[in-house]
Amino acid sequence: MGITALAFDFGTKSIGCAIGQSITGTAQALPAFKAQDGIPNWEAIEKCLKEWKPDVVIVGLPLNMDGTEQNLTLLARKFANRLQGRFGVNVHLQDERLTTTQARSEIFERGGFKALKKGKVDGISACLILESWFECTEY
């Protein structure tokens, strides 16, 4: 039996979200959540968690290309810790280097510049984070 996973691509203005199943190893983008000065809309996130009931939550870890941490890395870790503390969910961190670049490339290929909307990029980035977690995790 597979597991249901929910992934977040944390950002200080927008948080991408995706849902996926380990059986297929694929993910589907959900609407992005707005954040204000790095503070997530916890009510909307709680509603999403209740609706999808994930077995595990994945949070993208934004590292520099050389693997070192940046300011956003610390904020993403804090977000992951708060998810676990507030909702009691099992949270894992996943390296997200280049997911935003890859997401923009995929969206541009499908629809050009007009398709490059921030919410779509964040959602597809969350999909890529989740799919990469499925690929490199044994459950």
From Swiss-Prot:
Function: Could be a nuclease involved in processing of the 5'-end of pre-16S rRNA.
Superkingdom to which the source organism belongs: Bacteria
UniProt keyword Transcription, yes or no: no
Name of the molecule in the record: Putative pre-16S rRNA nuclease
MF-aspect GO terms: nuclease activity
Any single Pfam family the record assigns to this protein: RuvX
Example of a GO biological process term: rRNA 5'-end processing
Keyword entries, A-Z: Cytoplasm, Hydrolase, Nuclease, Ribosome biogenesis
PANTHER family: POLYNUCLEOTIDYL TRANSFERASE, RIBONUCLEASE H-LIKE SUPERFAMILY PROTEIN
Compartments where located: Cytoplasm
Family membership: Belongs to the YqgF nuclease family.
A single cellular component GO annotation: cytosol
Species in which this protein is naturally found: Haemophilus influenzae (strain PittEE)
UniProt xrefs under CDD domains: YqgF
Chief subcellular location: cytoplasm
